């Protein structure tokens, strides 16, 4: 029995499902989840000392690669001064200044401790600001596990085939209107009917929780226009895309400015951090300036701020995102060529340093229906074949993959060699 199998068996005694986040259980791909003990650069090392090229990157934060020495040094320096104060620090002021200088929509920002907390708070703020109750989200998009957002959600909800989580009261769900992603006409029609009741539209500008689905041409622009017409707050959930698809996030990449944005993952450099912010007029409604309450014991935690500040400064160097995108493109082109050579229906998607892999004969992946029509069983086999070849992909057909600046020619060679063998075995 492997060390991972032993640990997983032990974990199930006191941890529900043996994991602390559902997708880690490998339920959607089968087999025993890997337990890791070390990560460095583009690699993770499991408890049985097998090394893998990592395309999960802790689900997005590790854009520099694992254990970047500058980030580790920043955290070590802060450790000498304490773990948490529950009081303001200079680091959180520096972080706020830096984020607002990078992201087009950010005039004010508040730090929280997770992406879920950020989206939950942004929606509460939008409701308080507008005096309206209803929200619009999109089918297959995941915005964290707060009650009102677990209606037809993506990510783990898709992985386990549970679009509406038990435990969400009907009274909460009735205020959540769910529309098809990339369908701007459905948005216009709905706002034309109930626009005066809608506080906000929340959207992943790139849907990263039904794998990776970029916006159709005109979709984000159409959302901006529709929100302006009906007095609705437009929220971009940039927990995945923020600082990854471009330094200023998807809003900079696509040239569409939301009213509020939410962030997580990269902003903490691997530490548990989230943030939300946007227009000063709206953000001034947050306590203690305004009546909308939001608070957090560990918000602005100095260790997390140290890691996040260092990460954001490092990714600000000229050419960083071009290099990240170029590697991702080379890797995806190589996968596509090998799938085509093996006669395997296969489609890839990309937004900067994030990507999607679909076993599908479709010309493109644009809608939730396109995603759900992909061959999940074939993905399961591919996942394990790649794992055997030393490549760790996201353990679900509905999760995006991530590259880092630490991925280079050697990692590309390992990845494509493993893929060539995997596609041949899938015939």
Curated annotation (Swiss-Prot):
> Does Isomerase show up as a keyword for this record?
yes
Q: Which PROSITE patterns match?
A: AA_TRANSFER_CLASS_3
Its domain of life reads Bacteria
> Which Gene Ontology cellular-component terms appear in the entry?
cytoplasm
InterPro entries recorded for this chain? 4pyrrol_synth_GluAld_NH2Trfase (IPR004639), Aminotrans_3 (IPR005814), Aminotrans_3_PPA_site (IPR049704), PyrdxlP-dep_Trfase (IPR015424), PyrdxlP-dep_Trfase_major (IPR015421), PyrdxlP-dep_Trfase_small (IPR015422)
Annotated pathway: Porphyrin-containing compound metabolism; protoporphyrin-IX biosynthesis; 5-aminolevulinate from L-glutamyl-tRNA(Glu): step 2/2
Query: Its GO biological process terms?
Result: protoporphyrinogen IX biosynthetic process
A Gene Ontology molecular function term for this protein is: pyridoxal phosphate binding
Q: Which cofactor does it need?
A: pyridoxal 5'-phosphate
Query: Which sequence positions carry the modification called N6-(pyridoxal phosphate)lysine?
Result: 265
Q: Where in the cell?
A: Cytoplasm
Q: Does the keyword ATP-binding apply?
A: no
Enumerate the PANTHER family for this protein: GLUTAMATE-1-SEMIALDEHYDE 2,1-AMINOMUTASE, GLUTAMATE-1-SEMIALDEHYDE 2,1-AMINOMUTASE 1, CHLOROPLASTIC-RELATED
Q: How does it assemble?
A: Homodimer.
Record-stated family: Belongs to the class-III pyridoxal-phosphate-dependent aminotransferase family. HemL subfamily.
The name this protein carries in UniProt is Glutamate-1-semialdehyde 2,1-aminomutase
> What organism, scientifically named, is this protein from?
Pseudomonas aeruginosa (strain UCBPP-PA14)
In the UniProt record, the gene name given for this protein reads hemL
């Amino acid at each position: 029995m492997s060390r991972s199998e032993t640990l997983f068996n032990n974990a199930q005694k006191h941890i529900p499902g043996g994991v602390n986040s559902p997708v880690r259980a490998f339920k959607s791909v089968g087999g025993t989840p890997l337990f890791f003990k070390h990560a460095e650069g583009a690699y993770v090392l499991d408890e049985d000392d097998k090394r893998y090229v990592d395309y999960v990157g802790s689900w997005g934060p590790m854009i520099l690669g694992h254990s970047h020495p500058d980030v580790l040094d920043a955290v070590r320096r802060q450790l000498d001064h304490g773990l948490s104060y529950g009081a303001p620090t200079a680091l959180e002021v520096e972080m706020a200044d830096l984020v607002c200088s990078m992201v087009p929509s950010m005039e004010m920002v508040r730090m929280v401790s997770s992406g879920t907390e950020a989206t939950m708070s942004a929606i509460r703020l939008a409701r308080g600001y507008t005096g309206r109750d209803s929200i619009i989200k999109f089918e297959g998009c995941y915005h964290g596990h707060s009650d009102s957002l677990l209606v037809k959600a993506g990510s783990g909800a898709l992985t386990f085939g549970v679009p509406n989580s038990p435990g969400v009261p009907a009274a909460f769900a009735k205020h959540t209107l769910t529309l098809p992603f990339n369908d701007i006409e459905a948005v216009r029609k709905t706002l034309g009917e109930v626009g005066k009741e809608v506080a906000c539209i929340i959207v992943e500008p790139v849907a990263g929780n039904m794998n990776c689905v970029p916006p159709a041409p005109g979709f984000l622009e159409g959302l901006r226009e529709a929100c302006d017409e009906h007095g609705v707050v437009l929220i971009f959930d940039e927990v995945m895309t923020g600082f990854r698809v471009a330094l200023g996030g998807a809003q900079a990449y696509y040239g569409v400015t939301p009213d509020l944005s939410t962030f997580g993952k990269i902003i903490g450099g691997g530490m548990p951090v989230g943030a939300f912010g946007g227009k000063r007029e709206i953000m001034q409604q947050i306590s203690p300036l305004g009546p909308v309450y939001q608070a957090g014991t560990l918000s602005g935690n100095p260790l997390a701020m140290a890691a996040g500040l260092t990460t954001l400064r490092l990714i600000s160097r000229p050419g960083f995102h071009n290099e990240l995108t170029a590697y991702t493109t080379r890797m995806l082109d190589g996968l596509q060529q090998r799938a085509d050579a093996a006669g395997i229906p296969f489609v890839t998607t990309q937004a900067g340093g994030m990507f999607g892999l679909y076993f599908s004969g479709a010309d493109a992946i644009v809608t939730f229906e396109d995603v759900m029509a992909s061959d999940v069983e074939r993905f399961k086999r591919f996942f394990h074949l790649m794992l055997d070849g030393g490549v760790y992909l996201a353990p679900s057909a509905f999760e995006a993959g991530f590259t880092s600046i630490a991925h280079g020619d050697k990692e590309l060679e390992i990845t494509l060699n493993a893929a060539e063998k995997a596609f041949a075995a899938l015939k």
